Amino acid sequence: MATTLEEFSAKLDRLDAEFAKKMEEQNKKFFADKPDESTLSPEMKEHYEKFEKMIQEHTDKFNKKMHEHSEHFKAKFAELLEQQKNAQFPGK
């Protein structure tokens, strides 16, 4: 059975969403392990804040890149389907 563009796109979208959710869950677990802020020196508190911000920025960049790759794969798949259609039904 042939896969349609809609099926392929839906699967990539679902995988992107699942991966983003897993990344967010991992970040939450990681951030939950942070010591109580009242026990941290101002320097360590600043360090943790910078580190958390950096992790979130990298997560966001990674998720954006994953989405860009998915969009590229969708376009390539659509192109392949069009080529296949043209090969099967020339002149249509």
Curated annotation (Swiss-Prot):
Gene Ontology CC terms: cytoplasm; microtubule; microtubule cytoskeleton
Predominant place of localization: cytoplasm
UniProt-listed SUPFAM superfamilies: C-terminal domain of PLC-beta
UniProt keyword annotations, A-Z: Cytoplasm, Cytoskeleton, Microtubule
Function: May be involved in the regulation of the cytoskeleton through interaction with the subpellicular microtubules. May be involved in parasite mobility and attachment to the surface of the host cell. Behaves as a strong immunogen during infection.
Miscellaneous information on this protein: There are four copies of the KMP-11 gene in T.cruzi.
Name the record gives this protein: Kinetoplastid membrane protein 11
Organism: Trypanosoma cruzi
